[in-house]
Amino acid sequence: MGQDKLKVAVLFGGSSEERDVSIASGAQVIQALRSAGHQVLAVDTASGLLGAEEERRLLASKVKEVPPDSDSLAIIRSGKQSLLSAGELAGVDVFFLALHGGTGEDGTLQALLDAGGFAYTGSGHLASAMAMDKDVAKRLFLAAGVETASWLMAPASEEEVREQLGFPLVVKPNSQGSTVGLSIVHSQAELQPAIELAGRYGDEVMLERFVAGREVTVGVLDDQALPVGEILLGGQEVFDYEHKYQAGAVREVFPADLPPAIAAEAQRLALKVHRALKLSGYSRTDFRLDEQGRLWCLEVNTLPGMTATSLLPQAAAAAGIGFAELCERICRLGIERCKGARKARS
């Protein structure tokens, strides 16, 4: 890699329902960047800069089978400290956002960093906000010519659901990741309980036509599509929270065993999504491939999982990019983007 070494503050943890996943990402990113010779600070956005013992304890924790409950998150949020006032963060070259969900992914933290003139990884605040809002994102998919399943926002009448979506359908919070609060609904009787569950995790709830088929995913790095991957669900209807983060729950294949034309189309569509939402640095877009060979865009992730075995790093590995190199490239892309943004404003 041969460039100047960086001072990187890795932001992780936080107080969203994806806290455990973020800690796992942060642990791996910190280790990778340190192995490459960079100076790394570990910052839990719920509590601030971590000392050595705090860092060891927190980063050794594992992702549980279910997301943290609301009471646990309320305790974490009540102790929240100021993130950007710590003197130890002076001289940081870039903030690596190993955050998932909540204010770490929805543009809030990005706007704060922009206002402070700090360089950070991933997309800017407007792009992050658009991608996190599934309703807005799906409208942009369609505007870009990328097919996505029909949807309605709750509340919706029985007639609207029956005529526009049918059963089974997917019920999920409009602004959550990792399938938190998501249900597959097979009848009208199951619908209201599923809406109530999703409503615990956000103010808006989406109802979406269920697309049966193969689950494929495409990472984008520096405006280039990475090799396509497939998640072999093993009979599961959906790649849910438990199966995403428990070892051996599913099998992930990179590159996917797909006809070359379909793989190329998935890459083309992922790039269209990345550009339509004005994303930067890196992203990961998930699709369903139906029996007719049509690709349906499910969602785009602006801060995808960053453990060494997460989907984006697996895609990078299939392209010959090791995990430490991937983390460094993401850092340098963030620095370049923020320099460009500052120059444009001056």
UniProtKB/Swiss-Prot annotation:
Residues reported to bind Mg(2+) 2: 299, 301
Location(s) in or outside the cell: Cytoplasm
Coiled coil: none
Keywords for the protein's UniProt record, in alphabetical order: ATP-binding, Cell shape, Cell wall biogenesis/degradation, Cytoplasm, Ligase, Magnesium, Manganese, Metal-binding, Nucleotide-binding, Peptidoglycan synthesis
The protein's annotated pathway: Cell wall biogenesis; peptidoglycan biosynthesis
Gene Ontology molecular function terms on file: ATP binding; D-alanine-D-alanine ligase activity; metal ion binding
GO biological process: cell wall organization; peptidoglycan biosynthetic process; regulation of cell shape
Cofactor binding comment, as recorded: Binds 2 magnesium or manganese ions per subunit.
Binding of Mg(2+) 1, residues: 286, 299
Catalyses which reaction(s): 2 D-alanine + ATP = D-alanyl-D-alanine + ADP + phosphate + H(+)
EC number(s) reported in the record: 6.3.2.4
Main location: cytoplasm
Annotated ATP binding sites: 164-217
PANTHER family: D-ALANINE--D-ALANINE LIGASE, D-ALANINE--D-ALANINE LIGASE B
Protein name (record): D-alanine--D-alanine ligase A
Gene source species: Pseudomonas aeruginosa (strain ATCC 15692 / DSM 22644 / CIP 104116 / JCM 14847 / LMG 12228 / 1C / PRS 101 / PAO1)
Gene of this entry: ddlA
